[in-house]
Amino acid sequence: MATIFITGSTDGLGRAAAQSLLDQGHRVVLHARSADRAAALGGLTSRAKGLVIGDLRSAGETRSIADQINAIGRMDAVIHNAGVYTRPSRGATPEGHAETLAINTLAPFMLTALIARPARLIYLSSGLHRGGEGSLDDLDWTKRAWNAATAYAESKLHVVALAYALARRWPNVLCNAVDPGWVRTKMGGAGAPVDIDTGQRTQTWLAVSEDPAALVSGRYWHHLEQQEPAREATDPRFQDRLIGKLSELTGVELPEV
């Protein structure tokens, strides 16, 4: 059985993925933003291998999450599930970053760099990533007028590009990105067409399955099928520039092979 860490596992797709993997007999490490949010996990906590607490909008707390995970031990897979949708304003984290960028892009990048390297990495993206401008000149929205939809789309483009970059740089790790679709969660709303079980299925399959179809790297998935992502995501030059920018913003270097 595998050990899997899932960010943002108190509700929505993260909780559904945790429930599914626990039901399959796997060991799951849960994550909550705060102790108050952890209380919402209820009985899942007693079934889990561990619980880490930290707010991904804070670089300091993100580092703490990585430390907590490394203290538990090496993970077999990490599902980077946590994220926010459209924010009404740029906001500012304790470090001064745009909140959408910090939670959706900087946090998974930092955790990837700081957590002992697992065998599999899965990043939750969105079909909306294709609406990102693909510009790396103002990642942190310090010059542009705030556009919530564009900021979200760009953040989801970033994690697809990160998955492809890691597949190229870390050949011994299976790195993939997933579009779960428009799912009926608190974020997606009651009118979303995709049920939560369907929404969580691809990422949990990629995390633990020995099916040869799941043992691939550098792919973009939607409902167990591979799709083509935005052109920028597969461009090594874009990937390398992005990683350089993220290292500058976080002060964290991505380890080499």
Where are these regions (language model features)?
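Conserved hydrophobic beta-strands of the Rossmann-like cofactor-binding core
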Residues: 3-6, 78-79
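Conserved glycine-rich Rossmann-like NAD(P)H-binding loop of the short-chain dehydrogenase/reductase
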Residues: 24-40
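Conserved Rossmann-fold cofactor-binding substructure of NAD(P)-dependent oxidoreductases
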Residues: 56-74
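Ankyrin-repeat alpha-helix packing hotspot
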Residues: 105-106
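C-terminal helical subdomain
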Residues: 177, 193-244, 248, 252
